[in-house]
């Protein structure tokens, strides 16, 4: 049980334990999402990102930094060592296939590592590791990272599905964003 990080020692030609007992930091101030897809996001994702961008004066009461490396493995490593949350949510373009990332060879291995390191990994509506694959190419939404950020995202999705969430709003654009739909 647990997660340990190893680094290749090129001189010795072997991997050396450099990060024993990795634990994802509980508190975070970073999130990673491809903001160019904002116009396609579901309301729970818009709500979460809006709250993060509101900073100290917003409902999350701290300033967040947004990251996007566009490399799933690099993002997973950053979350493991620095904390934070990574979001590749289902959106208007990927809804019919269940998301964009491959469940079996992308989401499942990383979800297992994240949970072993004390974090969470969800689709937005449920735990990644609870999904029984229907086929080898199955796609999924994928949100992982510090539990303190994953849990509100799951709650927002459940509230949205139940019709009990608050509407997305922006002081400048009301229920729209900067990007046109």
Residue spans of the language-model regions?
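IMPase-like, lithium-sensitive Mg2+-dependent phosphomonoesterase catalytic core
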Residues: 1-181
């Amino acid at each position: 049980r647990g997660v340990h990080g190893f680094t290749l020692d090129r001189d010795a030609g072997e991997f050396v334990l450099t990060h024993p007992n990795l634990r994802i930091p509980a508190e975070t101030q970073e999130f990673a999402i491809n903001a160019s897809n904002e116009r396609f996001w579901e309301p729970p994702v818009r709500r979460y990102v809006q709250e993060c961008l509101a900073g100290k004066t917003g409902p999350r009461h701290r300033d967040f930094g947004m990251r996007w490396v566009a490399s799933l493995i690099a993002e997973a490593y950053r979350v493991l060592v620095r904390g934070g949350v990574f979001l590749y949510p289902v959106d208007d373009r990927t809804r019919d296939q269940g998301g964009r990332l491959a469940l079996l060879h992308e989401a499942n291995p990383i979800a297992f590592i994240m949970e072993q390191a004390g974090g969470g990994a969800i689709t937005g509506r449920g735990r990644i590791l609870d999904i029984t694959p229907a086929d080898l190419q199955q796609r999924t939404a994928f949100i992982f990272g510090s539990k303190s950020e994953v849990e509100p995202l799951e709650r927002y999705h459940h509230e949205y599905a139940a019709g009990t969430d608050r509407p997305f709003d922006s002081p400048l654009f009301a229920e729209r964003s900067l990007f046109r739909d």
